[in-house]
Swiss-Prot record:
GO CC annotation: chloroplast; ribonucleoprotein complex; ribosome
Family of the protein in this entry: Belongs to the universal ribosomal protein uL23 family.
Source organism (scientific name): Agrostis stolonifera
Protein name: Large ribosomal subunit protein uL23cz
Principal subcellular localization: plastid
Length: 94
């Protein structure tokens, strides 16, 4: 079973949200909020309060005369209950 999460995102906004117990991940665009919520709760052993998402467009690519683009993806902001945290990402707060 593929979990759908590509990687954690570390931008200025996502680092600011870490202080509010909100974690940001890029995920495959075909996964729903409930699937990602269920996977995060199982894998990290945390309680998820809410999941916000938005779809990011793919980037244009050019190889010689051929124009193409990369696939679009979805960014999820996962809000955890107070008292829970994802330990691998907590080091980035300090």
């Amino acid at each position: 079973m593929d979990n759908g999460i590509k990687y954690a995102v570390f931008t200025e906004k996502s680092l600011r949200l870490l202080g509010k117990n909100q974690y940001t991940f890029n995920v495959e665009s075909g996964f729903t909020k409930t699937e990602i919520k269920h996977w995060v709760e199982l894998f990290f052993g945390v309680k998820v309060v809410a999941v916000n998402s938005h779809r990011l467009p793919g980037k244009g690519r050019r190889i010689g005369p051929i124009l193409g683009h990369t696939m679009h993806y979805r960014r999820m902001i996962i809000i955890l209950q107070p008292g829970y945290s994802i330990p691998l990402l907590d080091r980035e707060k300090n």
